[in-house]
Structures are given as structure tokens and as C-alpha cells.
Amino acid sequence: MAPACTTAHRRRAPLAAVLMLSLLPLLSPHADAAQVPWHSRTFKYVADNKDLKEVLRDLSASQSIATWISPEVTGTLSGKFETSPQEFLDDLAATYGFVWYYDGAVLRIWGANESKSATLSLGTASTKSLRDALARMRLDDPRFPVRYDEAAHVAVVSGPPGYVDTVSAIAKQVEQGARQRDATEVQVFQLHYAQAADHTTRIGGQDVQIPGMASLLRSMYGARGAPVAAIPGPGANFGRVQPIGGGSSNTFGNAAQGQGGGASGILGLPSSWFGGASSSDRVPVSPPLPGSGAAAAAGSPASVWPELSKGRRDESNPIDAGGGAELASDAPVIEADPRTNAILIRDRPERMQSYGTLIQQLDNRPKLLQIDATIIEIRDGAMQDLGVDWRFHSQHTDIQTGDGRGGQLGFNGALSGAATDGATTPVGGTLTAVLGDAGRYLMTRVSALETTNKAKIVSSPQVATLDNVEAVMDHKQQAFVRVSGYASADLYNLSAGVSLRVLPSVVPGSPNGQMRLDVRIEDGQLGSNTVDGIPVITSSEITTQAFVNEGQSLLIAGYAYDADETDLNAIPGLSKIPLVGNLFKHRQKSGTRMQRLFLLTPHVVSP
């Protein structure tokens, strides 16, 4: 029950109501979001000491609006009024101090002492999400502004209990929705053929890093993951033998402390070539085939994908998890499990299907290839005869030409017309040709020359490899040289010989089984000449590329070197007598210029 009003209050109430009616637009502006849907534009009302709750019920009943009134709303009203329903309601609220709020269905009215405040924690949701949700639902009211803290994800709302409860419920739903959207799961994708983790292979004296599936996915999706450790690699023809126990040496004095970048070391070479300087002063190593272009420093392994290596080394790149750069909050986490050769991905559930589809397309079974290599040495004169014999075979004829000294050779195979279709890039004066079935005919002719001691097959290695995986065939000699320093001595190994590297790639969709061969040949010899007691290495390098069909061969010729031979014939016993022993010896020195040929034949073992 509302308390009885005094006589003075009853007399002042109509005057105060009229005064507040004129000041209402300036004191209490209302927003469209809280606008009550009144049915008439004018409201006429006469009251004589009538209870305020009854007046409010009469107002809502005349406009067909459901109303809830708190018992804390008290007072009486007297007077005659003719104004709009909204202005009449605002006038009463300003006069008697109650607060009202329309939630879209019910007009709710509370007493002045019932207002409250609430602090809303949004969790992972942003304050913009709550602000947009209130605007879409038309629940934002400038009479009860919500204060936001974007950094802390917190909002504070003050107003009538119903409004505060409504905003709190909406904030809770927004926070739960954001938590569900940010929920992640972990899935394991088992690989069958591809490598999950980065792996390092040693090619040509270098540690070449091959990115795995995890690195590929991280580079595409900007994901987080563990960086790959750098593995140093020495040069191609010489390397430093690590001391037992991991102790450091000081062979080159100040160079070991990073001060000898410009000093000369063994054989007049910079000391940094022997690992004595910092990584920034070392000789850069070259990437794998085709063997040209800039590469990483020797302090880190070369990579067949320079873009990925750069991304792992650059600290400003968000892909590098070890660089300290901040990543996007929704960035996935991709890791490799080398033990099971699997990929572990933590991300949102709706993205997992796209990962599975991409991994399935990349994890395809590579073809198994076989590379047959034949290294042939032919005397210079015999090489010219050989060139006359096999050079003039064509597609439709089988005519053997020569100088008449060689016998007639049979050839039953059909000659391939694609013998000149190879796209080759020979170096210098080296002859590079693609042979069809005539490759077997060439071997027949070489066998004939071998019987006359004019040619010999040095080696015929065969190696199996996978598609797009480099095959390496090395036949080298090593010599270890001891180099004394100020306080210790180091061993350096010098290597020389034949290194044949072939990278085969099957052309997809080729009807003839066409393959691309990237070939790099390094041929070196430890010469008889020495510098400071260290043998001089003479080396040559050939780099070429060619497209070869199934059954064809790639011939690389024109590489010559001089071979010296010394024969000694002596009578046992007498030839060892001092002074007169030379009368019973016979020495014969001969020099021969040899031509070296490389014949490569690729085969597809399993498609």
C-alpha cells in the first residue's frame, strides 16, 4: 500500500507534473530501441488523488500494452493531462523517480532504489560481438549505456533489474558462442609414402634439407610449429674431420675466434673454407640440381625449397615459431611425428576435412625408377672412329660408314626417330645427345673396341630411386692431410673421383613415358704435383638436362684427359746392382689422350 500523501503534496503534484512535461525532452531522451508501441498519439487523463500504480495501469490498458509494476513504485497523482502517451510516461518517471523498460512484450516499471549494476566477463568473445548483438536485437538503450573494455573483454551494465538481467543473459550466450567457435580438436593424419618431418640427406658433401609434409602445410596455412635445427655441411672436395670428444681446435689462430675472415689458410685458400670463421664469412654452398643460383650459408643446410628455408630463418616471418613473432589467434598448430610418420593438426573441427583432402592428394605413391649408368673410356683416335660408325644411323636406314678398318656390325633394333628430340644444355664443348635404341648398338661397338684395347668400360653402376628423388653414384679416393696449428693439429680429408648425380622426373601424362633427367657430373683426380706436400686436385664438372623417352639413353661425350703410363722391365737381381744395375733395366713411358663417355639409361620399374 502506498502511503497517504499530505495536502501540500497533493496541491503541488499537478504543477510539478506540468513543469516536468515541458522539460522532459531535455532531461530524459529515449531511443528507438526502447520505444513503446503506443496505439494513439494523444492521451487524455484526469486524476484526483489517485494511486500512481493505478494511473500506470490505466495508461497501459488504454494502449493495450502489458505492464508489470514493482511494489516499490509509490505515490498519488492529481490533475488534468492531455499529451502523448510517451511524454506522459516520461513525465511521471521524472516526477516520481521510477524507471521503466520495455523489452518488446511487457512494459516493466521499477522503483528508483531497485536499479543495479553488473560486470560481464566475455571470455574469448570481443566487446564488439556483444555490442552488435544488442544492436541487432534492438536492446541497446542510451538511458542505460553499457561500458566496454576491449582489452580486458569486460562490459559493465547499469539500469533496472530486468534490463541488466537481459543484457547479462545475452552476454553469456555471446561468450558461449565464441567459445564453441574457438573450440579446437587434434587429429592424426597417417602418411604412407610422403615424409612427415624434414629430413636431411648428404649429397655432394653437403647436407641438403628436404622439407616434409608438416613444413609444407605450415607454410601454406601460416601455422605454428617447431622450427627445424640447422645442420652445417662442409665443402664438396674437402672437409674438416671433427676431433674426438667434441673438443675445439685453434689451428688457424685468430681465425678460430672470428678475426681471420680475410686471412689465407692452407693452399692459399681463405681460412673460412675450413670452418675457421663465422657462418657469415663461410663459402656459400649450392643447392641441389641444377647446381646454380644463390644458396644458404654453410652454417645451415641447403634446401630444395628456398622459400620454406627463408621462412624458417626469417624471424619477422609469422611462419617461424621460434622467431618470437605473434601468430593469429586462429592459426592451426601442425606438428610432425617422425616415429609414426604422421601429421598432428590442432584446429577447428570444420577445417579438418580440408586438411585430410589436401594430405591425401599429396601423399601419393611415387614411381620406382632405375638408372643404368655406363662410364666408358676410349682412346682419342678410336673415339673418332666410333663417331663415324654410330653417328650416321637414321630412322629409315641402317648404313654403317667408316674407314674400312672395322668389321661390319649387325643391328636388328628399330631406330627411334626421337633421337634428336632431347632438350639438352651441354656445358662448353661437351657433346650431349639422346639416343634411342641405338644406345645398345653403341655398346656393341664399344665392346668391339674393347677387344682391341682401344676402349674400356670403367664401371656400370645401377641404382634404383624414386620419382623426383636424386640418385647419387660416387667413386672417389680420399686422402687425409694433417695440418698443425698453434696448440693442436687437425685432419682434413681431400676427395677426388667421379660423382654422378641424376635427378629423374617422370612427365605426368606422357604417352611415351617421357622422363626429365637433371645430370651433374663431377670428375676429379689427385694429381702427382703437390703444394707444401699436399696433392693438387684437378676437377671438372658437367651439368646438363634432357628429356628422354622410355628405352632411350642420354650420352655425354667430349670430356678428355691425359693418361700417362710407365712400363719397367728388369732382370731380377742384376737390375739392383748399384751403378751398373741400369744396364739391365728398360723403361718405357707412354702418354695417351682418353675420351670419357657417360651413357645414362632410365627405366620405370613400377608405375
Swiss-Prot record:
Regions of compositional bias (Low complexity) in chain numbering: 291-306
One cellular component term from this protein's GO annotations in UniProt: cell outer membrane
UniProt keyword Protein transport present: yes
Region annotated Disordered, chain positions: 277-332
Record localization: Cell outer membrane
Function: Component of the type III secretion system (T3SS), also called injectisome, which is used to inject bacterial effector proteins into eukaryotic host cells. Forms a ring-shaped multimeric structure with an apparent central pore in the outer membrane. Necessary for both basic pathogenicity and the induction of the hypersensitive response in resistant plants.
Gene3D superfamilies per UniProt: 3.30.1370.120, 3.55.50.30
Any one Pfam family match given in the protein's UniProt record, by short name: T3S_SPI-1_N0
Subunit structure: The core secretion machinery of the T3SS is composed of approximately 20 different proteins, including cytoplasmic components, a base, an export apparatus and a needle. This subunit is part of the base, which anchors the injectisome in the bacterial cell envelope. Forms a stable homooligomeric complex.
Major localization listed first in the record, in broad terms: membrane
Keyword Membrane tagged: yes
Signal peptide coordinates: 1-33
Keywords tagged on the record: Cell outer membrane, Hypersensitive response elicitation, Membrane, Protein transport, Signal, Translocation, Transport, Virulence
Family the entry assigns: Belongs to the bacterial secretin family. T3SS SctC subfamily.
GO biological process, one term: symbiont-mediated perturbation of host programmed cell death
Name of this protein: Type 3 secretion system secretin
